[in-house]
Amino acid sequence: MTHPIRWAFPDEPGPEGLSVSGSYFDRTPYVEQDEEGRAVYVEHHRTLGDRVRDVAASGFRLVDLVEPEWPAWNTSEWGGWSPLRGNLIPGTAIFVCVRD
């Protein structure tokens, strides 16, 4: 999944994407609407703690949380991500879980 920390930063690959623009703890959904005001895209932010509690409430046990580092060979920009940003904050969170 996309790493929850990215919620606090603007989707910009350059230096402007390195400054916090909102609260990490703000769980207000991000909503894009069409001309009639209907939701056409929605993202629901949750913190790492929220996700860990979701895992436990679902009967799973968290074994590991993997936050892959930006690969040195990747010099591309994609959306709000670039080597500049990717070398400083994680873009992905992988929850490794088992059901006991």
Model-inferred region functions:
Residues 58-60, 75-100:
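Core SAM-dependent methyltransferase catalytic element
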